[in-house]
Amino acid sequence: MRGYEVIIGFETHAQLSTASKIFSRASTAFGAEPNTQACAVDLALPGTLPVMNKGAVERAIKLGLALGSHIAPRSVFARKNYFYPDLPKGYQISQYEIPVVQGGAVSFFLGEEKKTVRLVRAHLEEDAGKSLHENFIGQSGIDLNRAGTPLLEIVTEPDMRSTAEAVAYARELHKIVTWIGICDGNMQEGSFRCDANVSVRKPGEKLGTRREIKNLNSFKFMQQAIDYEINSQINELEDGRKIEQATVLFDPDTGETRTMRTKEDAADYRYFPDPDLPPLAIEAEWIERVRATMPELPRAMAERYVRDHGMSEYDAAQLTQSPALARYFDDAVKAGATPKLASNWITGEMARRLNAQEIGIEAAPVTAQQLAQLVGRIADGTLPNNAARQVFDALWTGEGSDVDAIIEARDLKPMSDTGALDRILDEVIAKNAKNVEEYRGGKEKALNGLVGQVMKASGGKANPAQVTELLKAKLG
């Protein structure tokens, strides 16, 4: 961008879907009255000790299995020391030197180009409370309901080179954590929060100074914030100034980032092993028990579609955007649909209507069985493609529920009278002398105009492939 290379890395906090907190039995339910879900452990009262939540560990194992990571047989919890009003202990329990999940990668498509972002680690930690600044005059309120909520912080290498790539990575990671059920992915409630580390440099130069954009809680704001930060840093460098390392917040009202604090280094937090928690031991048998509970992963499902149905990797990736979408496709194929045709309709006409109405495929008025019947009629030649959209529309609006009945009621069967079709062909050729001349002169595209005229004259009942062949024969 503007002669600079963009370098982006991500830190994502995924709130784990446990019913209780990571080191206490207090509830993690969202939306309760302030300070009604904070127990003695969360409040750091004297004499309390943390007790590890087994469910949080198993969710971390699931992520490691999903991303091809190494799951550490022994990991250690550490105290991350800093002062903030909503952190009762004066430190956060996290992992530093030996995280539970190490390495791995997230692969995704940017357009039709396959990308891979490497992971450094994913570590377990507790969330802090929340400072409330609204409805208070001259002071702030503290809500400790969130204190101790289990988080998995997922850290990438600085592998992303554009805003689009960064957002695509975040969407893919969001898909994975919700697919395997370790996080509900609700960005509005803070269940999936992303921090983007952004820097720029001239090609071939050493890495530039990075600035961290905190708590991006929507993909739209993520794009706007990263774009603004990139341009801001380039402007600073072009004006001869240095980039200062800092943590910034994005203001969606102004579309700008503002400095929150100068960025700390690890030494500022004075990490040391937590003496109240023993090392976390994860045996191979435990990993295998967790593996047995895992659903088929989107990556494995996409590979199956490529292998069994002869799909492209891109089409397979589109169909595995969510478990519900993949399930719909599988149900259509089980009902007899040709995989390629079913894929085209699901990612084409179906997706267009779902997006327009802002609903998921679970709420689609056309069932997988109805779609299978529809594409079956296209495949056997009973229904031309353009007429198929009329049938789909009737199914979608509820005007009909049986494909064959709709075809019959709307008289959509293809022309069987070859004499009538031949007369239409002759009329179209006679009325479109210019197209005929251009086609005979070597312009293949001119034939498309003639085919379109025949389809229009036949009321969409002619078979386009048959029309094309007949026209070629007539025009020599």
Swiss-Prot record:
SMART domains for this protein: GatB_Yqey
Database matches in InterPro entries: Asn/Gln-tRNA_amidoTrfase_suB/E, Asn/Gln-tRNA_Trfase_suB/E_cat, Asn/Gln_amidotransferase, Asn/Gln_tRNA_amidoTrase-B-like, GatB, GatB_C_1, GatB_Yqey_C_2, Gln-tRNA_amidoTrfase_suB_CS
An annotated Gene Ontology molecular function: ATP binding
GO biological-process terms attached to the record: glutaminyl-tRNAGln biosynthesis via transamidation; translation
Catalytic activity: L-glutamyl-tRNA(Gln) + L-glutamine + ATP + H2O = L-glutaminyl-tRNA(Gln) + L-glutamate + ADP + phosphate + H(+); L-aspartyl-tRNA(Asn) + L-glutamine + ATP + H2O = L-asparaginyl-tRNA(Asn) + L-glutamate + ADP + phosphate + 2 H(+)
UniProt-listed SUPFAM superfamilies: GatB/YqeY motif, Glutamine synthetase/guanido kinase
Catalytic activity, EC: 6.3.5.-
The keyword ATP-binding appears for this protein: yes
Key words, A-Z: ATP-binding, Ligase, Nucleotide-binding, Protein biosynthesis
Pfam families: GatB_N (PF02934), GatB_Yqey (PF02637)
NCBIfam families: gatB (TIGR00133), PRK05477.1-2 (NF004012), PRK05477.1-4 (NF004014)
PANTHER family in the cross-refs: GLUTAMYL-TRNA GLN AMIDOTRANSFERASE SUBUNIT B MITOCHONDRIAL AND PROKARYOTIC PET112-RELATED, GLUTAMYL-TRNA(GLN) AMIDOTRANSFERASE SUBUNIT B, MITOCHONDRIAL
Family to which this protein belongs: Belongs to the GatB/GatE family. GatB subfamily.
Quaternary data: Heterotrimer of A, B and C subunits.
Function of the molecule: Allows the formation of correctly charged Asn-tRNA(Asn) or Gln-tRNA(Gln) through the transamidation of misacylated Asp-tRNA(Asn) or Glu-tRNA(Gln) in organisms which lack either or both of asparaginyl-tRNA or glutaminyl-tRNA synthetases. The reaction takes place in the presence of glutamine and ATP through an activated phospho-Asp-tRNA(Asn) or phospho-Glu-tRNA(Gln).
Name recorded for this polypeptide: Aspartyl/glutamyl-tRNA(Asn/Gln) amidotransferase subunit B
Organism encoding this protein: Variovorax paradoxus (strain S110)
